[in-house]
């Protein structure tokens, strides 16, 4: 799986023998992001919640992956929700960019896929935003928790969904179920 890891080992082994090589050092240099991702992806795969699956469309590009969350409790039980994650070059100084690809009726996720999760914010007033000490594991566990304990109707991104829940919880549940049947199977 971690083919980038073997590339890093190979590149480290070539450092000494490259002094006379004609290729420039910058074309073979591995970014800090990619070095971090090798370690973080291994940690993530070892500590993945049972309701989550990670897929790397290209195993040589650990900075682009998809996450599937299949909640086993709560309003969203029975659905499969796809997220696309892109880790920018400036990682770990900035958070990954995450978008929900599955249309969903959720107070913290818009129907167009924007996500309200404090640890994905570069700047956060409450101190719970992104910090260089956070990892991909934190991001995945945070996204998973949006379907259970981090489901937040008091500080919504999708105000219409939050107000719907306040007005009529049963109708809210029915609409969530309808979205799951139409978009999240």
UniProtKB/Swiss-Prot annotation:
Maturation and modification: The acetylation of Met-1 increases affinity for DCUN1D3 by about 2 orders of magnitude and is crucial for NEDD8 transfer to cullins.
Catalytic activity entry: [E1 NEDD8-activating enzyme]-S-[NEDD8 protein]-yl-L-cysteine + [E2 NEDD8-conjugating enzyme]-L-cysteine = [E1 NEDD8-activating enzyme]-L-cysteine + [E2 NEDD8-conjugating enzyme]-S-[NEDD8-protein]-yl-L-cysteine
Keywords assigned by UniProt, alphabetized: Acetylation, ATP-binding, Nucleotide-binding, Transferase, Ubl conjugation pathway
Family matches, as CDD domains: UBCc_UBE2F_UBE2M
Transmembrane segments: none
Gene3D superfamilies recorded: Ubiquitin Conjugating Enzyme
Entry superkingdom: Eukaryota
Pathway: Protein modification; protein neddylation
Entry GO terms, CC: cytosol; nucleus
EC annotation from Swiss-Prot or TrEMBL: 2.3.2.34
N-acetylmethionine: residues bearing it: 1
Example GO biological process: protein neddylation
Residue ranges of every copy of the UBC core domain listed in the record: 32-185
GO molecular function (one): ATP binding
One Pfam family per UniProt: UQ_con
InterPro entries: Ub_conjugating_enzyme, UBQ-conjugat_E2_core, UBQ-conjugating_AS, UBQ-conjugating_enzyme/RWD
Catalytic residues (UniProt): 116 (glycyl thioester intermediate)
Binding partners and assembly: Interacts with UBA3 and RBX2. Interacts (N-terminally acetylated form) with (via DCUN1 domain) DCUN1D1, DCUN1D2, DCUN1D3, DCUN1D4 and DCUN1D5.
Biological role: Accepts the ubiquitin-like protein NEDD8 from the UBA3-NAE1 E1 complex and catalyzes its covalent attachment to other proteins. Together with the E3 ubiquitin ligase RNF7/RBX2, specifically neddylates cullin-5 (CUL5). Does not neddylate CUL1, CUL2, CUL3, CUL4A or CUL4B. Mediates neddylation of the CUL9-RBX1 complex.
UniProt record similarity statement: Belongs to the ubiquitin-conjugating enzyme family. UBE2F subfamily.
Name of protein: NEDD8-conjugating enzyme UBE2F
Organism, scientific name: Rattus norvegicus
Record lineage: Eukaryota, Metazoa, Chordata, Craniata, Vertebrata
